[in-house]
From Swiss-Prot:
Disulfide bonds: none annotated. Pfam families: UPF0262 (PF06793). This is UPF0262 protein amb3341. Transmembrane segments: none annotated. Belongs to the UPF0262 family.
Length: 157
């Protein structure tokens, strides 16, 4: 029997339609696809999944709007956006360095930057798991993909 504590649907909710670079849209699509293929997502309470998750930025908060698969609202988990701003900013900076390095650097230089990028991504994932602690339980791979989506939400175009 497949586990039921998982996401069956995930959407980024944005007030305005944002046109992002093709690379960013590709990263978003891959993160969503990978999440739906395999994830562990268990909101605190007597809830039984699968779940639909809507992630949105609202004022100074990141909102995880969790619903049943049939869209019945279950719980909204607000997280302070400030918690993630620094790590997202650092992550974007290292990604820019990585993409610049691909064009002109040696393979060993690219690999070093990529290791740093992955390390920062892992740090953001752990921070997300920590902030969701006691509210929503997620495994590390799920947190990594959710962190990718949080980064996508921060891109304004």
């Amino acid at each position: 029997m497949p586990h039921r504590q998982k996401l069956a649907k995930i959407e980024l909710v944005e007030k305005y339609q944002v046109r992002r670079a093709a690379e960013v849209e590709h990263e978003r699509a891959v993160a969503v696809y990978d999440l739906l293929e395999e994830n562990y997502f268990a909101p605190n309470g007597d809830f039984i999944g699968p779940y639909a998750l809507y992630i949105k930025l609202e004022d100074t908060r990141l909102i995880f709007d969790v619903r049943k698969e049939d869209e019945t609202p279950l719980v909204q988990v607000p997280l302070p956006l400030k918690t993630f701003q620094s790590i997202v900013k650092d992550y974007f900076m290292i990604c820019e360095s990585y993409f610049a390095a691909i064009k002109k650097s040696t393979p060993s230089q690219i690999e070093a930057i990529d290791m740093g990028r992955r390390g920062l991504h892992n740090e953001g994932s752990e921070l997300l798991r920590e902030r969701l602690g006691g509210k929503i339980d997620v495994d590390f791979d799920t947190a990594r993909r959710l962190f990718t989506l949080i980064c996508v939400l921060h891109i304004r175009g």
